[in-house]
Amino acid sequence: AKWIKNPVSFASKQDVDIIVELIGGSENVAKKIVFSALKKGKHVITANKALMAKYGDELAYIAEKNNVNLEYEASVAGGVPIIRSIKEGLIANKINKIYGILNGTTNYILSTMEKTGKNFHDVLNKAKKMGFAESNPLADLNGSDAAAKIRILSSISFNRTISNNKILTEGIQNIN
């Protein structure tokens, strides 16, 4: 293994065909790496839902223009191939609505609270200990994680960009 001091310049290397970005975030080095790689004709694989929610349409355009693949299946629903299913399996169908549980942490917390009668903070702490919640679960709890996922899925399903202000977001951090 070799340590790369400047990951953005790594995308310019002739002997690199595919960049896998797992840094996360939409306004940091991850953004620079992905944009640079696509513009330099490199295929990109990312699990970065924040980046795809904010810049997905622009990144898809750059990828198409440079005849490279932009793969982001892991950015929504982890191991469930929902993006590929929508893009390939349901392409002939008209999608009118999207329903689903888009955040596993929220699902675990609410389900456990209902089943056990325990309070939010106790269940959240248990979720952290079990690895179901991040050490800083703010994006899960305030709804921004689910909003990013619905923005990505809506963009694909309805073939248009959905602005953040059109997505009603309500977190669970104040629930009892």
Give the predicted meaning of each segment.
Residues I23-K40, A47-E88:
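Rossmann-fold NAD(P)-binding glycine/threonine-rich loop
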Residues D122-N176:
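Substrate-binding/catalytic subdomain of NAD(P)-dependent oxidoreductase enzymes
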Residues A1-E27:
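A structured beta-alpha segment of the ubiquitous adenosine-cofactor-binding alpha/beta core
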